[in-house]
Structure formats: structure tokens, C-alpha cells
């Protein structure tokens, strides 16, 4: 349990916003505006004529019913779509459960209270003891990373938006929930390696289905202890700034959270609660500095939606939050590619040098180098070893998985090949 809480502090309120932002490396400007969920690019794809199209309609429909014509391209066959859609099934059950009430839980609405809060409360010896127990329980339920932060209204949507009735409505997170438990679930490395493909979308579906069970289970555990709790996925608020405040990782050039354990290959969930717990400090391991010299995601993005410049307050369109100096992604270009491909895209995750299996010593060394002045050497080494290349989906179906030794062989074989080429000259 000790390594789980190495960056924990016993503070229950934001007593100094400026200090809190500095710790999280947030640069908030005077023209900051909270975000309206209606402007999220996925919500816009339902009401905004600039985003909504026949392709976007088919894109969404393909997750619920078969396409009329299957593509023959590797990774886009009926089998690939069948697997992708099956991985979404658990998440879809919750999302569709109350559609007749104009609710899409987990995406437009937080999950409701399925069981009452116990009348008698379980008390803990200290906020740290409470945090330790909740983190342990969350991991038992399947969370891969867990952090705790304070409720920060700046990240809450000003309004929620219904994809079905196309109407705005109040954000109904109950008052008094001052603590947020943020969870991260890793996505499958080998599936992500096949992107772009419908097959790779299974990594996303597995992540969301897993996420739903984790946040619902943790929330119910808290209710059973006598504390109010609300489970949430993409609904109600922006996940990434909360995850950064909770110490799960740093912000990357591609606009994603980069964790120390899995890089950007995670799905995020959260639970709002009134159980007093020790909070986690933001984590820094050199991501901002490394992303400053790396352009892997910028070069890899098929539609050039990722900036190659320095962090800025510039926004591309209404789907970007205003008033924060950071790297910003053009969501309109990004979603347009999703709709055109008829499946979600994770190329920026696949090519990211932080997308590794850190149970291996070599990758741990590389992560350490990325946080030092030797980061350029690490980047060169990463490219030399051939990381981030696309795997043919048919190889995944044949059972081929990530092989650590192959990368080592590639490194030395490429060196030998170079020497042989020089001799031929």
C-alpha cells in the first residue's frame, strides 16, 4: 500500500487555487470559460450541421446494427466489427437503459443511485486511512490506477446536452460531494497496435465496459458505508484535468493524459463522494519537456489535427475550452476522420513513445531517460527500435502479440544491415 500513496497530502479543500494550479502545471488565463457539453465535438455531431453528416450517422449506427456492406480491407471485416461492437455491449446496456427517459448514462448523464445510501456511517481513523481503503477497493474492482482530488467546479460542464432531444439541461451533480476519486483502466496494447482499424476500436469498447463496472461498484461500496457517491464516465465534467490533479499523470501534446504506468493508453472514470479522504498531489515525470521535442503524434495523425508548436491559448473551434495555455487538438478534423473510417482512431496513442508495457526493465529505463536531458537520445532510440508501427489486424487474429525480444532483435539487426550497406558502397 505504501507505493500507492507516495504523493498524498491531507488537505480537503482548495485553499489556494493559484498554488493548486501551479502544482498541476495549469496555466489559466483571465478569459477562462467553463465548458458547455453541447460544444463537445461528439455532441455537436448530433446538432451542428458543420459536423453532422451522413457519414457520422452511419458511424454511430454501425455500433448498434450491421453495416449493409462490409469492407474487405484487413481490420474492417464483419468479424472485426462484430468483436468491436461486442466489447461495447456492457457499456451500451447502461447507456441505453433509460433512453426512453432521455438519459444516456455514462456519456450525457451520470449514473443514478441504484441502491440507497446506508443510514449508518462507517468512520475511518483518518482521511489517509479512508483514501488507502478506497484505493485498495477500487483496485479490487479492477481499476489499474486510482487517485483522489478535490471537487473543482471549473471542470464541471455548465450545462449537459441530450443527444436525443437535442436540448440543454442543468448539470445535476448533488451538492456537498467535495471529493473525486479518479480511476484509469488500461487499454489493450495489441489491439491499439492495429489502429486504424475497426478491430482496434475493441480496445476502446473494452475500456468503457470495464470502466462502467469499476465506477459503479466503487460508488455502491461508498453508499454501503453510508456516504453519498455518484459514478461518472464522460458525463458531467472534463476528466483529464481532474486526473492530473489526482496525480494520475501529465498532459500530452496529443491532448491526452499520459500516465506513468501505461502512457496515454487508458480510459478514465470518476466517482464524486462526500467521504473525507487525503488528496493526491499532481505527478511530474518529464512529459511536458519530452512532448516539447517529440512530434510523433503530430506526424502520425492522419488528418494533422495535432499541433506541432508550443502550448498556447489558441483554440481551433468551439470544441476547445477557452482560457488555458496548453496543447490543443482540432476535434473537428479528428472526428471527421473517425466518421470517414467508420471507427474510432487511436493513432496518436499507438505512436506515442510513452505507449509501452512498463513491466519490462528496458521500457522503465526509457521512461526515465525521457524525463532527463537525455530525452533526445531516448526519442532517437525509440524510433530506431521501430516502436509505434502498425500491426496488421490479421496477425492479431492469428494470435501474434507484443514480443519484447523482437524489438531488441530489430535494433541489432538494423545496425548490422546498416554496416552491410556501408560495405556494399
Label the predicted regions.
Residues 1-191, 197:
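Non-catalytic, usually N-terminal nucleic-acid engagement modules in DNA/RNA processing proteins
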Residues 2-36, 309-425:
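Flanking helices and flexible, charged tails adjoining ferredoxin-like Fe-S electron-transfer domains
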Residues 96-121, 252-281, 397, 401:
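Amphipathic repeat-derived elements
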Residues 124, 135, 141-356, 364-371:
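Catalytic cores of enzyme domains
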